[in-house]
Amino acid sequence: MSEGESQTVLSSGSDPKVESSSSAPGLTSVSPPVTSTTSAASPEEEEESEDESEILEESPCGRWQKRREEVNQRNVPGIDSAYLAMDTEEGVEVVWNEVQFSERKNYKLQEEKVRAVFDNLIQLEHLNIVKFHKYWADIKENKARVIFITEYMSSGSLKQFLKKTKKNHKTMNEKAWKRWCTQILSALSYLHSCDPPIIHGNLTCDTIFIQHNGLIKIGSVAPDTINNHVKTCREEQKNLHFFAPEYGEVTNVTTAVDIYSFGMCALEMAVLEIQGNGESSYVPQEAISSAIQLLEDPLQREFIQKCLQSEPARRPTARELLFHPALFEVPSLKLLAAHCIVGHQHMIPENALEEITKNMDTSAVLAEIPAGPGREPVQTLYSQSPALELDKFLEDVRNGIYPLTAFGLPRPQQPQQEEVTSPVVPPSVKTPTPEPAEVETRKVVLMQCNIESVEEGVKHHLTLLLKLEDKLNRHLSCDLMPNENIPELAAELVQLGFISEADQSRLTSLLEETLNKFNFARNSTLNSAAVTVSS
């Protein structure tokens, strides 16, 4: 088993104080121009800036540093305060969220449930969901709080973007609307496929963020576990029309509440704003009905009406909505190829595209569609697909702007809720038992497995990419025999210190699933060509 380790370094993104003048794909730029005139800061402003960057507190591990500056971009039920913080290892800004429990005993009663919920949230790995990094409890003599670190979204909310669009007398681009809806539904489908399902419960245009490249991220997943047992008093929601009618009427809500909220977001994205009663933020049902009637596309109107049905059981699931005619398009070969490249990027050299295209004859024919008698065939030249455009498209696919929804969506890898108390490891029959390595305690947040045939019927080659919770990547590879004992292989990885014991069963399941896929694909192949399968 060979290993390559690399520490992933993330860029800090755009400066939160400067607003990008770029717009989402398919939309006219609506951001105000940035003037080049600058003036010297006054001593009072400099002092205020220094106060905001002052470090108030550190995490127990020393990695996260809380600043004085509060984050006002989110309105999350159950969260008492949110501050800007610094990730000292990655060099990026994050959000330091605090949940205050009224009494220490209240936290103790809920401790196990709180930990289980946050363990699930940290495992979430989706390009369209704001990332949860870490959490810990701070328990004092007479009070307790839970602190958790989330990704910082320096870009504005979707609500802000829609307001700017309306102010500049622009209209919503249909392609952008479809792209945004697809990204949001992809994230909701991922959350709802957890076991048990994770209900967002706070989906509004204020809690959906849009980046300068058109990437959508939903944030503010506030679990009911902290909503119902904290010091925070719930104030009247300013966006009541986003909440399903059954809120407050039933004890246990379902994922259908997120579908209702999504429908309201989709409507607001389409019409830019749903008019309320004058100064009041309350939006009556009549205003919602009027906004729906403004929609010219009957498919779009039906799509939104399905989401806003008063009976929860009649609302479609996020997965079903992805296949609604208003959204669904058969993916192009270009998109399928891009997802294939991105899915195997750990096996492709960084400069592969540049090497392939630098000696290419741009006047050569890339593809040709034959035509009938008397008609010229339709040709596509290499010059019509410049390398820079391909690079940009691959980057957009990698970032999650074009999720592939026509096939099975990625499912969350469920964490092991209870610690494994028995450290018994079956002995390996392939090699002598090695000396015990240093025990790995970090969790694996993402597993990718690839199997390809090397010698037909004799052996295969396994490549495994593991992303640990501290952003460390492990790239492992080995030869795999047709009759390989997968549980023993996973146990050997634990013994060698490559994965934690808590991740052993998850890895075993992934390896067995990928091997079954590989065997099925190989048996279905009519010739002896090499077969490659990834999971």
Swiss-Prot record:
Effect on the protein upon substituting P432L: In an ovarian mucinous carcinoma sample; somatic mutation
Residues modified as Phosphoserine: S2
Superkingdom field: Eukaryota
Comp. bias regions, Low complexity: 27-42, 414-432
GO biological process: DNA damage response; endoplasmic reticulum to Golgi vesicle-mediated transport
Keywords recorded for this protein, A-Z: Acetylation, Cell projection, Cytoplasm, Membrane, Phosphoprotein
Database matches in SUPFAM superfamilies: Protein kinase-like (PK-like)
Modified residues (N-acetylserine): S2
Cross-referenced PROSITE patterns: PROTEIN_KINASE_DOM (PS50011)
InterPro entries: Kinase-like_dom_sf, Prot_kinase_dom, WNK_Ser-Thr_kinase
GO molecular function: ATP binding; protein homodimerization activity; protein serine/threonine kinase activity
Pfam families, per database record: Pkinase
GO cellular component terms, A-Z: cell cortex; cytoplasm; endomembrane system; lamellipodium; membrane; nucleoplasm
Sites of Phosphothreonine modification: T431, T433
Protein family (similarity comment): Belongs to the protein kinase superfamily. Ser/Thr protein kinase family.
Protein function: Required for embryonic development. Plays a role in intestinal epithelial cell fate and proliferation, thereby involved in the architectural development of the intestine potentially via the regulation of Wnt-responsive genes. May play a role in subcellular trafficking between the endoplasmic reticulum and Golgi apparatus through interactions with the Rho-type GTPases. Binding to the NS3 protein of dengue virus type 2 appears to subvert this activity into the alteration of the intracellular membrane structure associated with flaviviral replication.
Protein name (database record): Nuclear receptor-binding protein
